[in-house]
Each structure stands twice: as C-alpha cells, then as structure tokens.
Amino acid sequence: MCFTPIVSLSTAILEFVVATAILVFCRKSLINKFFPLFIYTLGFYQFTEFMLCTTNYAAFWAKMGFITYSFLPAVWLHFAIRLTKRKFNYLTLYIVPVFFSVMALLKTDFIISSMCTTFFVVVIKDLFNSSIPLLSFIYGSYYFGFILLFCYFLLKIFNKEKNRIKRKIYLIIFSATLITLFPALILFIVLPAFKFMFPSVYCEFSVLFTVAAIIASYLDNKIQKKK
C-alpha cells in the first residue's frame, strides 16, 4: 500500500536507477551486491502496486506484490549471516516464503479484494482471514522474527567491528531498518486491522532505505578503493 499510482511508479524508477548505479559505479563487495538486490526487490514491489492500479489484472499484481515482500526478511537475514562469515545452509531461510508464495499462486481466492483509493492501494488477503489462524501466525512470526534476527546479527557485527567506516555502514543499515519497520511491528500487534495494510511501510521504507544505500555504498566503496 502506497500513494498511487504515480508515486509508486516514481519510487520504482528511482530505486531501479539507484540500484543500477551502485552496480556500475561501486566496487564489488558483499554490501554493494546486497544493496542492489534489495533495492531492485523494493522497486519491483512498487511496480506491482502501479500495475495493480493501472491494469485489469489487479489480483495477479496483488499476488506478485505479496510474493515480492514475502522474500525480503529472508534476504535481510541471508545478508546478515553472510556478514558473520558463518557456515549456514542459506536455502533453509527461503522455505517459508517459498511455501506462502506457492500458496498465493495456487489459491484462486487468495486475494479477497484490492482497490486503489485516492491515496492508497489496499489489498486484503485470505492469509489473514483464513479459517486456519496458524498460517497467519507462522507468516507473522517468520516476517518479524527474521527482521529481529537481522537486527540482532547486525548489532553484534557492529559491536565487534573495529573499522570506523564499516561501523558507520552497519549503523546506517540498522537505523534505517529500526526506524521504518518497528513502527509496523507495533501497529501489527496493537492494531490487528493493520495486518491488512502493514506492507504500506515499504513506501516510506523504500525511499529511506534507498537514501541509506547510497550513503552506505559510497562509504563501502571508499574502503574497497583502499584495498
């Protein structure tokens, strides 16, 4: 859910341009590989919202949007664990999002309703109206649980890091995540109705994270040039 539809498209274009610029102009490193992937994903989510509002395939694009943002926590955690340099079977991180993505694709009535209002795109999914509340619980636990784990690992890496520039990079990533996603977590718990709408955070998060990515990639590029 985001301001529609021109803001969604403009945000998507901005993110595609920034992600491409990072790939082209910044030296290759784990951080500068992660940022483009993540920003392209955020940009595609904004694109799905634009398509939802401007085509006759609203249900399809609503599903694509759900699938897109469902993979974000797994990508976050994948990145954080890679930073720790621990051995880990990364494929296991994607079991839950793959399951719910397949569910969304195969279930014809997965999207209950979708609409574009003056300011927002509102999508209501069967996942949160299911007669099996366990599915909603698993999805919510995965989503916010992985984000919490990401923050935990990143904070741990930050505390161990001696390089001042790298510490700044980790702090920027951590702050962008904390500021934008924890309000959604609180609203998700305090206001149950918000569970239909919490992806709206990605409109604000996309812009903020893109700015954070530019700064962090610039700093990381300075480190890579010194090597």
Task: Please provide the spans of the model-predicted regions.
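Juxtamembrane membrane-water interface segments that cap and precede transmembrane helices
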Residues: 117-135
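Helix-loop junctions at the membrane-solvent interface of multi-pass transporters
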Residues: 24-25, 54-55, 189-190
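Juxtamembrane membrane-water interface segments of multi-pass membrane proteins
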Residues: 22-27, 81-90, 152-171, 218-226
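Compositionally biased, low-structure terminal segments
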Residues: 89, 111, 120-121, 129, ...
